[in-house]
Curated annotation (Swiss-Prot):
Inhibited by aprotinin and dithiothreitol. Monomer. The keyword Glycoprotein applies. Optimum pH is 7.5. This is Thrombin-like enzyme BJ-48. Its EC number is 3.4.21.-. Keywords: Blood coagulation cascade activating toxin, Disulfide bond, Glycoprotein, Hemostasis impairing toxin, Hydrolase, Protease, Secreted, Serine protease, Sialic acid, Toxin. One of its GO terms (molecular function) is toxin activity. It is found in: Secreted. The lineage of its organism: Eukaryota, Metazoa, Chordata, Craniata, Vertebrata.
Amino acid sequence: VVGGDCIPQVPFLAFLYSEYFC
């Protein structure tokens, strides 16, 4: 999930998305 979502579709990549897309 891109666009500033802190809750990605993939829990495993949650820490990645939270850093890059928050």
